[in-house]
Amino acid sequence: MQQSPHSPQSQSLSASAVDSAVPLSKLQQTYAVIPRERPQTPLLDSVDSPADLKTFSSAELITLADELRLFVLYSAGQSGGHFGANLGVIELTIALHYLLDTPQDQIVWDVGHQAYAHKVLTGRRDQLGTIRSKTGLTAFPERAESVYDTFGVGHSSTSISAGLGMSLALRYQGRAQTVACIIGDGAMTGGMAFEAMNDAVQQDADLMVILNDNDMSISCSIGGFSRHLAMLWESGYQVDISDAGEPILCQRPDMQAFDRRKRHKEQRDVPQLEDNLFKAIGFTYFGPFDGHNIPELLRVLSLAKQVKGPVLVHIYTTKGKGFAPAELDPVGYHAISSLPAEDNAPKTEKAAIKPSLKYSQVFGQFLCDKAAQDKKLLAITPAMEEGSGMIEFARQFPERFFDVAIAEQHAVTLAGGMATQGVKPIVAIYSTFLQRGYDQLIHDVALQNLDVMFAIDRAGLVGEDGATHAGVFDFAFLRCVPNMLIAAPKDENECYHLLNTCYEYQGCTAVRYPRGVGTGATIIQPAQIYNIGEAVIESVLGTDDAPKKLALLAFGTMVETAQKAAEMIAKSPLLASSCQLHVVNMRWVKPLDTNLLETLVEQGVTHIATLEEHMIMGGAGSAVNEYLLNESAAFKIHRPTICNIGIPDRFVAHGSQAEQLADCGLDVEGVFNQLQNLLS
C-alpha cells in the first residue's frame, strides 16, 4: 500500500509511538444490560468526522472504544438491529478511521451489518437511533447516505471484489489511495471472496484485506476453511514483515478468552508456516492478532498499509464483545428488537393468546415430520440454520442436515448431485440469496429435471433490512425456467400442505413464503397433497345480476388482503350494488389454473385484477396476462379490463413491512383504492 499524504503518522499517535502497555483491562468495560437512557460519552461527542480522531492519545482511543460500544448498545436498544457483529468491530473501526485518510482512502465493509460504529464516526452519531426506520439510516452502508460509504452492501462475500475494482481503477488513474476490505470468516466461505483474492494476486493490486475472524457468521462458522483459520490461530502469530529490522512477534492473548477455538485443536496437528492458505496463493499475511487491542491494531495496520501488492491482516474478535449476554449467546444476539417501552401501569391478568407460527417454524415442523416418514429426505442450507427454522431438524437428523456455509451456488448444485442418487434434497434458502445460485438452478437442476425442492423463505418485502434483502424477484426469475413448479401459500396451513405436495412431486419445485408470522391458521393433519395448478375461489361477494364483475386473483400472502379489500368494496355505497367480486386464491404461479381463468372469462367477468407481493414486471400478474393474451380462447371473444397490482418498478426503501406495503399500495386501503379506480 502506498502512504497517503494525509496519513496520521506525524500526529500525536504515530504507529511507532503507540503505547502498547496501556492497561486495556482497566479501560475496556463489559456490560450486562442495555441502557435505556443515553449514556455520557464526552469523547465520542467530540467526534463529528474521522479527522477528529487524529489528535487522540492511545488511552483516549481505548476510552473512546468503551464509549462507542456503550453508545451502540444504547442505540440498538432504541431501534433494534444487528447487534453482536457491531460490538465486535468497535476497536477495528476506530483504528481504521484513525490510521486511514477517509473518505479519500476507501473502506469496504462486507455484508455491512457490522458498520454501526463506522456510521457513528462518520457524522451520523445522532441519527443512529433511527437506523432501519423508514426515515432513518439504512441498515447497511449505502453510497447515497454518506461519502464514507464507498460501496453498497447487504449480501455476503462481495467486499474483496468491490475493493479490488476500486484499487485497479485508482491505479489506472494514477491515484495513490488505500483500499481496505473488512470481511468476516463466515463471508470468507463464499466462493466469490476466493475468486477475488485469486485475481488480486494476478493483478498484483495494492489491496488490504482485513479478515475479522470471530468464528461466526450468523451462527458458528463451519467447514474446512473455518478449521484452517483455527489452525492458524493455534500456531501463534505469523508475520511476514520486519519492524526496524526485527520480526514482529506479539504475545498471543489468553486462550481462555477464545475457548471456542479449542474445539478445533484436536482436529489436526498445529500447522507449519507453509500451511498458510493466504501465503500460498500470494498474499502477504499478518496475523492472527487480537482485534480488540487498539495499539496493536494500529501498529500492524500501519505496517500492512506500506506493503506493495495484496496483503491480508488476520484479526481475532469476539462477537458481542463487551455485552456479557451476547458474548455467551452470539447467535441469539446476532440481531435484536428494540426495547419495549417501560410500563409502570398495574398489571392485570390477561387471557393467554397463542402466538401465530412463523413461516420458518412451519417449514421446520414439516421438515421434521416428513423426515420421520421418509428416509430419503436430506436438507441443505447455506448458513441459515436458525433463520430457516432447521435447528430441530439438525438436532434430530444430524446425518441428513448439510450446512454448506455461505455458498449458495454450491448448495444448489450439491442438491442436484444428491438427486441423481435417488434421495430427495430440500434446499432451504432465502429468496434474495437464491438469486446467487440462479445459473446452478437452471443448468444443474431444472435442465436435467432433477428431483429437488426449494423452500424459499423471506419472499416479498422484508422490512427494516430494506432493498438488499427483499425477495421480490423470484416469481419472475423462476417462472421462466422450464420444468419448474412454483407454489405460493396464503397461510401457515396451506404452506405446510404445499410443502408436502411439492415434496411428493417428482421434479423441480419451489414453495415461496414470507418472513415473519402467519395469519394464525391452524395446521390440519395429516399432510395433504393438493392438485397441482388448481386455484381456490375463496369467496363471491355481490349478486349475479351486477353489471360489473371483478375477478380478484391473489397470490400467496395477498389473499387475506384481497379478501379484506373486497369486503370494503362490497360495503361501499358507490360500488356495492353494481359489482360482484370473486376472490381467488391462485395458490400456484406455475402452472396457473388456466381452467379457472377460462371459466371466469366465459362467465362474463368485466374486470380482472391480479395481486401479488412481488414486482409487477415479470411477476404472477404478467403470467396471467401472457396466458389471456396468447392462449385463452375465451379472451379472444370477451375481453375484460385487466389490472396488475404489485410492487412498482423501483427498489423499496427500508421501513417496517407494514410501511413498505403501504408505500407500494399493497396494504388493504391501498388495494381498495386501486380496485375502486379500476371499477369506476
Swiss-Prot record:
**Which GO cellular component terms, listed alphabetically, does the Swiss-Prot or TrEMBL entry include?**
cytosol
Enumerate the cofactors the protein uses: Mg(2+); thiamine diphosphate
Q: Which Pfam families match?
A: DXP_synthase_N, Transket_pyr, Transketolase_C
Superkingdom of this entry's organism?
A: Bacteria
Q: Where is this region: Disordered?
A: 1-20
Instruction: From the UniProt record, give the pathway where this protein acts.
Output: Metabolic intermediate biosynthesis; 1-deoxy-D-xylulose 5-phosphate biosynthesis; 1-deoxy-D-xylulose 5-phosphate from D-glyceraldehyde 3-phosphate and pyruvate: step 1/1
Q: How is the cofactor bound?
A: Binds 1 Mg(2+) ion per subunit.
Please give the catalytic activity noted in the UniProt record.
D-glyceraldehyde 3-phosphate + pyruvate + H(+) = 1-deoxy-D-xylulose 5-phosphate + CO2
Q: Which of the seven top EC classes does this enzyme belong to?
A: transferase
The record lists thiamine diphosphate as bound by H113, G154, H155, S156, G186, A187, N214, F323, E408
- Show the SUPFAM superfamilies listed in the entry: Thiamin diphosphate-binding fold (THDP-binding), TK C-terminal domain-like
CDD domains cross-referenced by the UniProt entry = TPP_DXS, TPP_PYR_DXS_TK_like
Known EC number: 2.2.1.7
Where are stretches of biased composition, namely Low complexity?
Answer: 1-17
What does the entry give for GO biological process? 1-deoxy-D-xylulose 5-phosphate biosynthetic process; isopentenyl diphosphate biosynthetic process, methylerythritol 4-phosphate pathway; terpenoid biosynthetic process; thiamine biosynthetic process
Record keywords: Isoprene biosynthesis, Magnesium, Metal-binding, Thiamine biosynthesis, Thiamine pyrophosphate, Transferase
Which residues are Mg(2+)-binding? D185, N214
What is the documented function of this protein? Catalyzes the acyloin condensation reaction between C atoms 2 and 3 of pyruvate and glyceraldehyde 3-phosphate to yield 1-deoxy-D-xylulose-5-phosphate (DXP).
Q: Matching NCBIfam families, A to Z?
A: dxs (TIGR00204), PRK05444.2-2 (NF003933)
Q: Of which family is this protein a member?
A: Belongs to the transketolase family. DXPS subfamily.
Can you name this protein? 1-deoxy-D-xylulose-5-phosphate synthase
